[in-house]
UniProtKB/Swiss-Prot annotation:
Family as reported in the entry's similarity comment: Belongs to the universal ribosomal protein uS7 family.
Gene3D superfamilies: Ribosomal protein S7 domain (1.10.455.10)
Name this protein carries in UniProt: Small ribosomal subunit protein uS7
Gene name for this UniProt entry: rpsG
Entry keyword Isomerase: no
PANTHER family documented for this protein: RIBOSOMAL PROTEIN S7
Function: One of the primary rRNA binding proteins, it binds directly to 16S rRNA where it nucleates assembly of the head domain of the 30S subunit. Is located at the subunit interface close to the decoding center, probably blocks exit of the E-site tRNA.
Biological source species: Aliivibrio fischeri (strain ATCC 700601 / ES114) (Vibrio fischeri)
Length: 156
């Protein structure tokens, strides 16, 4: 960690099609080996499929899916006197978004559909309806935090 000054977070350019910073971040998370145009095709294809299936606006379903996957609390390991405790801590807003997007992409990659766009679209549709692997992951994280509530006083 720097001692002199806190370095601000780099500003991300909004995506060209929907002018959304969240979507631009999502494209970056989907991207593999620096192939951004391929990642954009996948994400935009998934959004089109999603809008077709749900009949709602592209971004509205995406936002709703993200909202349902965002974790409020997580556990961090804290070593106290020879034993390690899982201490529940609140998640900062930026990390909340990052975790939600990462979990959604990971869940989509594990699905069985043919193309990545289809997998992503179906995972986002499931997440917008509060079901699916990504939502289950969030529930597991919340359950862990709830189970370790007794160690909340070890927070730093």
């Amino acid at each position: 960690m720097p001692r002199r000054r806190v370095i601000g977070q780099r500003k991300i350019l909004p995506d060209p099609k929907f002018k959304s910073e969240l979507l631009a971040k999502f494209v970056n998370i989907v991207m593999v080996d620096g192939k951004k145009s391929t990642a954009e095709k996948i994400v935009y294809g998934a959004l089109d499929l999603m809008a077709e299936k749900s009949g709602k606006d592209h971004l509205a379903v995406f936002e709703e899916a993200l909202e349902n996957v965002r974790p409020a609390v997580e556990v961090k390991s804290r070593r106290v006197g020879g034993s390690t405790y899982q201490v529940p801590v609140e998640v900062r807003p930026v990390r909340r978004n990052a975790l939600a997007m990462r979990w959604m992409v990971e869940a989509a990659r594990k699905r069985g559909e043919k193309s990545m766009a289809q997998r992503l679209a179906n995972e986002m549709l499931d997440a917008s309806e509060n079901k699916g692997t990504a939502v289950k992951k969030r529930e597991d994280v919340h359950r862990m935090a709830d189970a370790n509530k007794a160690f909340a006083h070890y927070r730093w």
